[in-house]
Every structure is written in structure tokens, then in C-alpha cells.
Amino acid sequence: MVVKVKQKIPLKIKRMGINGEGIGFYQKTLVFVPGALKGEDIFCQITAVKRNFAEAKLLMVNKASKNRVKPACSVYETCGGCQIMHLAYPKQLDFKDDVIRQALKKFKPTGYEQFEIRPTLGMKKPDHYRAKLQFQLRSFGGTVKAGLFSQGSHRLVPIDNCLVQDQLTQDIINKITQLVDKYKLPIYNERKIAGIRTIMVRKAQASDQVQIIVVSSKEVRLARFIGELTKAFPQVKTVALNSNCSKSSEIYGDETEILWGQEAIHEEVLDYGFALSPRAFYQLNPQQTEVLYGEVVKALDVGSKDHIIDAYCGVGSIGFAFAGKVKSVRGMDIIPEAIEDAQKNAKSMGFDNAYYEAGKAEDIIPKWYKQGYRADAIIVDPPRTGLDDKLLKTILHYQPKQMVYVSCNTSTLARDLVQLTKIYDVHYIQSVDMFPHTARTEAVVKLQKRV
């Protein structure tokens, strides 16, 4: 390497990386610079030197891109929750198209150069879109603050006015910090592994109902806290306590108890309603979820004789879009509370052809096939880690005729397509901007078994 840590260098940014950073070359050394944009001439300082690349901190933009904008967020550079707010929104969508192309080029699934990559579907107003927050709590000089850890650290950045967060959820977390202070509730101490560590606030867009999870390493007395909070915000319908005594970075423990209110809140998507319990997964951008699920519906050509598997089904929200027009829908999820919601939702909507089971897809699907169930189509919506190897082998073994892959990580998507394109053709990839101002995107991939 020709560069050293703390060295200051000029750099021409040639392109943007998958995490939103600018990329340039200094005497043949690849340099990643967060905050820099394609086409810019910058001055930066090397912060880390690796075997094949270096990382740097942006010091000055000597020649700015015409697509650079001033972020409206006061903590944008320290928070780390958003990565590309300094890029004009239409160009953010172009960037997300390019991220998909970069991932495909890296992993090279069969026929990737001919894949149809459709332009990312963006938002008209890409602000205050997050209906869910998970903020950490810490004490600053005796005052409780809520926020996010700065990128790659355990240093909390207090946030009281997040520009991508739904305003009601932000107002509620602000009130929560005041009440935690007022009632002297214990705040998490990393050395003692004790106290309240995380607060989750989620709003259902359709009903304005709100649920809250207090994550604590020990039992806390919340009666007065709950009384004052629910009086100030009658939209709050559920307060739950999750016990997490782990030293790991996992947000939640295994046990969640409803302390006050109803078991679930009411949400709607694609003209049907469903219950959502506190631990159940649901997309955090309700407006774009309508768009995303609409694309899933378009991608599957199914009828009254077809059977569908909805892997990673959550509360059943994707599968319900098909339950009224197919022979059967079966789904599974590793979170038991989500499956309970899915079962209740199916019953309330009269879908007696929908069946849900708690467990891993790679374990349950082979069991169903041994029992004689045959799926004509499968929908997968895995976490950022992508498909489990065992599930990939299961899909390749049983070979449903159609498949829709909903991905929140283009790298693991491209990796999984290497295996899937052994028997499937990719018809197209349609990305949906679920997370404006971040480097993340969501993609719907239509696959058809090769004849």
C-alpha cells in the first residue's frame, strides 16, 4: 500500500459503492470515502489501510457534484442511520439501480448480463416514512436520551427530530425519555448488564394505533409510566416488556409480556386488514409496502388450482393477497407470535385455505412435501442474510414452477441467484425504495422454472 493512516490526499471519485460511499483510486490504491459523490474532486484523510483497499474521511469537496444537496438533518454526519441524504433524491433511485448491477457483476449468476433491471420505484415525499423505531436509551449527565449508535461504535447519538421517522412515533419516544427521567427508571448499564436498553415504537398506518416494547435486562415497575404515557398519547394501545439479559448486541430476548392494553394493533395493506403483535415482523414503510406487495402480486401468475408457499411469512400479509384466488397458501416463520397473528388473521378474513406453522422454512417445507403437499409457486422474503443453504437446496430439489424472491440485501440476493439460476430464469428485477436516504433497497425478482 502506498498510503498510510492519517495521510491526507486529493482524490477523484469515479463511482459509488454499495454502501453509498464514494470510490476513487490513489496511485492504484482503491479508496472508500463516505459522503463523497461520483464525479467530485475531494481532499480526504486515510483512516484505515486494508490489504486491498483503504478507507478515508472526507475533509473537503473541491469540486462538488451537481447532484449534491445539503442534508436537512442536523445529525446526519454522526448518526449513520442514513448514508446518502446528501444525494438528490432522483439520483438516489439511480444509485439503487446501480447497486443491483454491481452485486450481479460481483457474483455473476447465470445470464446476469441479460437480466431486465427495472427502474427503482421511489416516493413522492421521501420523508417521515418510517412507521417503526428502535432507539437505544442512555444517560447523559443524568438526563435520559434516546437515539441510535453512531456507525461502528457504541456511542449514542441522541435524536429528537428524525427526518425519516413518522412524527407520531418521534413524539412518543421524546415523551418516553421524559417519563423515564421523571420516574427514575433504571437505564441500561453495559458493565452491570442492567436496566432499560431499547424502546420500540410502531404505528399502524391504517388505524393510527401504536404499540410499544420496553426492552430491559430486569423487571421494571412501569405502572405510573404507562398511565401518564397513554393519557398523553391515546393512540398507544399496547405496552409490552421484553426481557433481554444477554451481553450480545441482539436487541430482543426470547420472552415478551403484554403489560398493558391489547395483544395486537390493526394494520391494512392491499385493501385487507390484519392484526400485528409487538414482536411480529412487518415492513417499516407502509406507503411503499403497498407498492412492494403490489409488485409481488404482479410477478406471480397463479389461479384457482395452484398452491403457494409463503416462506418467511411474518403475519401472513403477502400470502393473503393470493389466498382468495388460489387453491391454498401455506406459510412459516421462526417467530411464534407472528404465526399466531397469521392464523388469527386468516380466520378473521375467512381464508380456510391458508395454513401457517412456526419454524424454519428449510425444516418445514421438506416435511410438507413428505406429507404430499406440492407447491406450484413459492415466495421468499428472507432477512438480510439471504436464503439459508438448506432452504436453497430444498427449493432446487422440489422445484416449484414459479418463484418470487423479495430481497432487502442485493449482495445476498445476487449470491443466492447463482444457485437459483441453475434451474430458474430471471424474468426481471424490480426494486422499490423502501428506505429513502439510505443505501438500502428492496427488490422483487420474478423467476420461472426453465423448461
Curated annotation (Swiss-Prot):
The active site is at residue 408. Residues 2-60 form the TRAM domain. Keywords: 4Fe-4S, Iron, Iron-sulfur, Metal-binding, Methyltransferase, S-adenosyl-L-methionine, Transferase. CDD domains: AdoMet_MTases. GO terms for molecular function: 4 iron, 4 sulfur cluster binding; metal ion binding; rRNA (uridine-C5-)-methyltransferase activity. Its EC number is 2.1.1.-. InterPro entries: MeTrfase_TrmA_AS, MeTrfase_TrmA_CS, NA-bd_OB-fold, SAM-dependent_MTases_sf, TRAM_dom, U5_MeTrfase_fam. [4Fe-4S] cluster binds at residues 73, 79, 82, 162. It is an enzyme of class 2 (transferase). It comes from the Bacteria. One of its GO terms (biological process) is rRNA base methylation. S-adenosyl-L-methionine binds at residues 283, 312, 333, 381. PANTHER family: PTHR11061:SF45, RNA M5U METHYLTRANSFERASE. Belongs to the class I-like SAM-binding methyltransferase superfamily. RNA M5U methyltransferase family. This is Uncharacterized RNA methyltransferase M6_Spy1337. It comes from Streptococcus pyogenes serotype M6 (strain ATCC BAA-946 / MGAS10394).
